[in-house]
């Protein structure tokens, strides 16, 4: 899946679209995607000057965006302006190595389970053979304008 197909599936846009390409997609099971990390990313100006490092929360967001692509494919749906896919939880997030300009971040997501409209995924972000981040992610789809139940 190239960037043209990705922007039809995700509502995110620059500077918050964090998936550049899907290289593997196995329906109802797993996805592998790429985020090419460049020195032009706006967050590098302040994180950290002289030693730029991709913020961990953005690595988690990249994993969540890849999970959204997998979920919409599994549901056989195309998102529209009436529905959004929300990240609702993160468990066990661990950061193992910094992600720097020039790195190619590989985003590997597998579906763990779907229960009561909540999707649970296992996510692994790596650079080459090194794990950069691992986490369990939970997401759900909501209609825009649906009342908040919290």
Curated annotation (Swiss-Prot):
This is 3-hydroxyacyl-[acyl-carrier-protein] dehydratase FabZ. Keywords: Cytoplasm, Lipid A biosynthesis, Lipid biosynthesis, Lipid metabolism, Lyase. It holds the Pfam family FabA. It catalyses: a (3R)-hydroxyacyl-[ACP] = a (2E)-enoyl-[ACP] + H2O. Its EC number is 4.2.1.59. Gene3D superfamilies: Hotdog Thioesterase. It is found in: Cytoplasm. GO terms for cellular component: cytoplasm; membrane. InterPro entries: FabA_FabZ (IPR013114), FabZ (IPR010084), HotDog_dom_sf (IPR029069). The gene is fabZ. Belongs to the thioester dehydratase family. FabZ subfamily. HAMAP family: FabZ (MF_00406). The active site is at 47. It is an enzyme of class 4 (lyase). One of its GO terms (molecular function) is (3R)-hydroxyacyl-[acyl-carrier-protein] dehydratase activity. One of its GO terms (biological process) is lipid A biosynthetic process. Involved in unsaturated fatty acids biosynthesis. Catalyzes the dehydration of short chain beta-hydroxyacyl-ACPs and long chain saturated and unsaturated beta-hydroxyacyl-ACPs.
């Amino acid at each position: 899946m190239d960037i043209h197909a990705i922007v039809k599936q995700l509502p995110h846009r620059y500077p918050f679209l964090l998936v550049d390409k899907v290289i593997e997609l196995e329906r109802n099971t797993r996805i592998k995607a790429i985020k090419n990390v460049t020195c032009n990313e706006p967050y590098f100006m302040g994180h950290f000057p002289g030693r730029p490092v991709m913020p961990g929360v953005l690595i988690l967001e990249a994993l969540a965006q890849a999970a959204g692509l997998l979920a919409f494919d599994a549901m056989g749906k195309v998102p529209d302006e009436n529905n959004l896919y929300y990240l609702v939880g993160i468990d066990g997030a661990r950061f193992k190595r910094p992600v720097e300009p020039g790195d190619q971040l590989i985003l590997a997501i597998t579906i763990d389970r779907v229960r009561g409209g909540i999707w649970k995924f296992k996510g692994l972000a790596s650079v080459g053979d090194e794990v950069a981040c691992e986490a369990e992610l939970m997401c759900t789809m909501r209609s825009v304008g649906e009342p908040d139940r919290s």
